[in-house]
Structure formats: structure tokens, C-alpha cells
């Protein structure tokens, strides 16, 4: 399998993405390091899909990870320091998730595995800065970026919330999720009946004291690989808007009192049958190989 991977898109929360560098070094695959903070899974997925769509690769690996203790040491305080965390703070997830993207044409020849879903669209996010400076309230810093990307996505794709079974953000958690709903309502967009946040799903918050919820690159990656994709494969959800969110801070900018810009990248993931029905209607004249240029298997 590693020989068939043309590119690896990988990133994490540590400086110079060293977790990714050491973690995938033995794969001996061409690697493109990426950093989008906690939005990195959305960044790797969207970039990987565009590479495959453009014909630059038949198979790419998209992977990210995060680790609680290392993130605390780099961005806040070492765990053994015993710093008290406010209720707005999020708990960095120790976890990793990876997916392989392949073109339809490549799948018809290799038959590596049964594909779970298809990526049918991406919306690359813009940096949005509302002047938030509290590193213990990253949900508030990321919510405006999530709002901006979701609104832009609806405009670009001429869609509305009801076109998706779920709209899933990365790690806004309790505070950021409420802010997102309010910000979208100001724009006359209501996603409250179908919104889900990975940071609120990853932990059992009634049993685990994680304050506002989960965060980190691994948060959305783990939920995507272990929960979202199986739900789509079972046709429980047929169309999902996956929007990982990231707070673009560093320990230097934080210590200097700079604000925390946010970013979010949206990826449309669809069940195979629901996509194929619409795809066939619009592309009857195209062959399967040509059709592979406009859709990506996961």
C-alpha cells in the first residue's frame, strides 16, 4: 500500500510538525507538511482531493494527530505545573486519524478496498480575526471563521442547511458552538437542528471533566474516521458538510498579547449512492474515467 501512495499530506500541532515527520518517516512516501492548527484534517482532505482531482495522483494519504500533554506544554503550561483551567478551556485530544483518497479510475483498476464515501466539494477558509486574545477560550476565536466558511460555502455551491444531513464543525465545543449558531442566525441561516461538533462528541462530558469539550487536530480526525464515515457508509447520513476549525496562535504571539486568528475549511462528503444518482443525471455523456475527475473516493 505505501508504494501506491503518491503523496502524504500530514500535519499536527507541534512546532515544525515534528510529530508528523517522525511518525510517517518510515513510509518513505513523498510528503507535504501542512499546518492549519485544529483545522488540519480539513486542510489535508481538501488539498488531497484537489491533487487527485487535478490528476497529479491516484492515491494520497491525509493524516493528522494531536497529543494533550505536548500541546499543553507548547501552548499553555506543562501538566505538572498544576495550572487551573477556566471553564471555557478545551481539552486537547490525544489521537490520530487518517484516510486514503483515490480517484474513481484508480479504484476500478486496483480494487484496494470498498470505498466509504466521496468528496464532492471543498471550500477553503479565510483567516478571520475578531481580536480574541484568550488562549483558554479558543472556541470564541474559531467560531467567526467557521461562520464565514459556512456562509461562503452556501453561496458558492448554491446550497442551504437542509441540503445536508449534518453540518459538523471541528472543535468549537460548548462556547464556540453556541457562538456559531448565533452568528449564523444574524445572517438568517439556521443550522441548529443539524449541527454537530466533534469537540462535544469526543468525550463523555457528564463523566469526564473536560470543561468546554475537546480540541486538537486529532479531535475532528478521530471523529471523522471512527464515527462520521461509518455513518455515511451505512447511509444513515447521505450528505455531510465537514468543517474542521483552527485557532492560529503560537506561543510567541500569545506571549506578546497578539490576537488569535481563526480558520475553517469545509469538505462535502457524500454517500456513494446519493452522489451517484445525481452524478449520473448530470453527466450521462461522461465515461466512468472522466467522471472520476469530478469526484473522489475515500
Question: How should each PLM-predicted stretch be described?
Answer:
Residues 9-11, 60-66, 101, 240-245:
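Short beta-strand segments
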Residues 1-6, 149-163, 231-232:
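Phosphate/pyrophosphate-binding loops at sites that engage ATP/ADP/AMP, CoA/4′-phosphopantetheine
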Amino acid at each position: 500500500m505505501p508504494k501506491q501512495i503518491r503523496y502524504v499530506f500530514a500535519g499536527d500541532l507541534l512546532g515544525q510538525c515534528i510529530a508528523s515527520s517522525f511518525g510517517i518517516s518510515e513510509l518513505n512516501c513523498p510528503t507535504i507538511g501542512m499546518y492549519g492548527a485544529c483545522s488540519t484534517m480539513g486542510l489535508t482532505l481538501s488539498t488531497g482531493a484537489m491533487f487527485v482531482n487535478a490528476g497529479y495522483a491516484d492515491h494520497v494519504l491525509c493524516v493528522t494527530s494531536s497529543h494533550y500533554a505536548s500541546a499543553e506544554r507548547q501552548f499553555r503550561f506543562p501538566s505538572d505545573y498544576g495550572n487551573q483551567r477556566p471553564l471555557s478551556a478545551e481539552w486537547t485530544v490525544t489521537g490520530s486519524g487518517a484516510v486514503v483518497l483515490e480517484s474513481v479510475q484508480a479504484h476500478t483498476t486496483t480494487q484496494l478496498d470498498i470505498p466509504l464515501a466521496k468528496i464532492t466539494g471543498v471550500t477553503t477558509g479565510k483567516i478571520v480575526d475578531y481580536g480574541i486574545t484568550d488562549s483558554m477560550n479558543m472556541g470564541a476565536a474559531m467560531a467567526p471563521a467557521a461562520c464565514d466558511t459556512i456562509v461562503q460555502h452556501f453561496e458558492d455551491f448554491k446550497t442551504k442547511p437542509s441540503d445536508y444531513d449534518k453540518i459538523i464543525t471541528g472543535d468549537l465545543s460548548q462556547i464556540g458552538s453556541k457562538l456559531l449558531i448565533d452568528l449564523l442566525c444574524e445572517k438568517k441561516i439556521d443550522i441548529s437542528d443539524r449541527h454537530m461538533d466533534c469537540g462535544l462528541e469526543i468525550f463523555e462530558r457528564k463523566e469526564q471533566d473536560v470543561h468546554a469539550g475537546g480540541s486538537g487536530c486529532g479531535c475532528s480526525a478521530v471523529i471523522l474516521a471512527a464515527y462520521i464515515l461509518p455513518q455515511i457508509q451505512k447511509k444513515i447520513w447521505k450528505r455531510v458538510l465537514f468543517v474542521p476549525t483552527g485557532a492560529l496562535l503560537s506561543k510567541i504571539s500569545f506571549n506578546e498579547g497578539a490576537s488569535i486568528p481563526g480558520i475553517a475549511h469545509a469538505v462535502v462528503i457524500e454517500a456513494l449512492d446519493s452522489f451517484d444518482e445525481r452524478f449520473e443525471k448530470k453527466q450521462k455523456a461522461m465515461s466512468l474515467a472522466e467522471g472520476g475527475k469530478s469526484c473522489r473516493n475515500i
